[in-house]
Every structure is written in C-alpha cells, then in structure tokens.
Amino acid sequence: MKNRDIIVEAGSKVLRSTPRKLNLVADLVRNKKVSFANVQLRFCEKKAAGFIMKVLNSAIANAQNNYGLNVDNLYIKEILIGKSLTLRRVYPKAMGRANRMSKFYSNITIKLKEIV
C-alpha cells in the first residue's frame, strides 16, 4: 500500500452554525487543492469560513504528522456537513403568547487525499 491510498480525516462536532450556511462555504473548496482552499477560506468574509478553515488546518496537520504526506500534493476529497443538535428557546410575543425559536448546530468532517 502506497501513500496515495491514504485518506486523512479531521472533524468537528457541535458547531454553532446552520448546515445550510456551512454548505455555502464548503461548496467553494470541494475537490480543490489544499493550498487553493486555504487562500479561498482566508479571504471569505463569512463566519462559517473560519470553522471550515480550522478543521482543514487540523486535517493538514494530521496528514503531515501522522502519515508524513506532502502538503503540496493534497486535495480535499470530501467535505461532509451534517445536522447536529437543535437548541430550543422560548421567544416572547405580544398579548402573553410565546413562540419557539430553534438554534441549529452542525458537524463537519473533511477528508484529504494525495494527488496521484
């Protein structure tokens, strides 16, 4: 088994952002080289870009330290964004009524692979 068969993985759970917002940013860097993705995320002004960049840097560190892979040959094979828990809150309304407010959380998993 050569290094090119290795898939490096990193993830983060229970992030305070909705999956829809994270997917907008994740679509920018799917199937791109790691160096290009880092630049894209650094200059993206969305809060979700910071979350994805942290997980991407963790995956890069895993590739270097655990497998000894070269960063220049890595690309993002897969970015998985999933639903996590939902926090329910009560939102007071007029005339003694109340509505329910939901705060959504997400999970991220990034898989890197070496370019053949």
Swiss-Prot record:
Keywords, in A-Z order: Ribonucleoprotein, Ribosomal protein, RNA-binding, rRNA-binding
A GO term for molecular function: rRNA binding
GO biological process: translation
Highest rank taxon of the organism: Bacteria
This protein's record includes keyword RNA-binding: yes
Any one of the GO CC terms: cytosolic large ribosomal subunit
InterPro entries xrefs: Ribosomal_uL22, Ribosomal_uL22_bac/chlpt-type, Ribosomal_uL22_bac/org-type, Ribosomal_uL22_sf
Functional summary from the UniProt entry: This protein binds specifically to 23S rRNA; its binding is stimulated by other ribosomal proteins, e.g. L4, L17, and L20. It is important during the early stages of 50S assembly. It makes multiple contacts with different domains of the 23S rRNA in the assembled 50S subunit and ribosome. The globular domain of the protein is located near the polypeptide exit tunnel on the outside of the subunit, while an extended beta-hairpin is found that lines the wall of the exit tunnel in the center of the 70S ribosome.
Recorded family membership: Belongs to the universal ribosomal protein uL22 family.
PANTHER family reported in the protein's UniProt record: CHLOROPLAST 50S RIBOSOMAL PROTEIN L22-RELATED (PTHR13501), LARGE RIBOSOMAL SUBUNIT PROTEIN UL22M (PTHR13501:SF8)
Protein name from the UniProt record: Large ribosomal subunit protein uL22
Organism of origin: Wolbachia pipientis subsp. Culex pipiens (strain wPip)
Gene name of the record: rplV
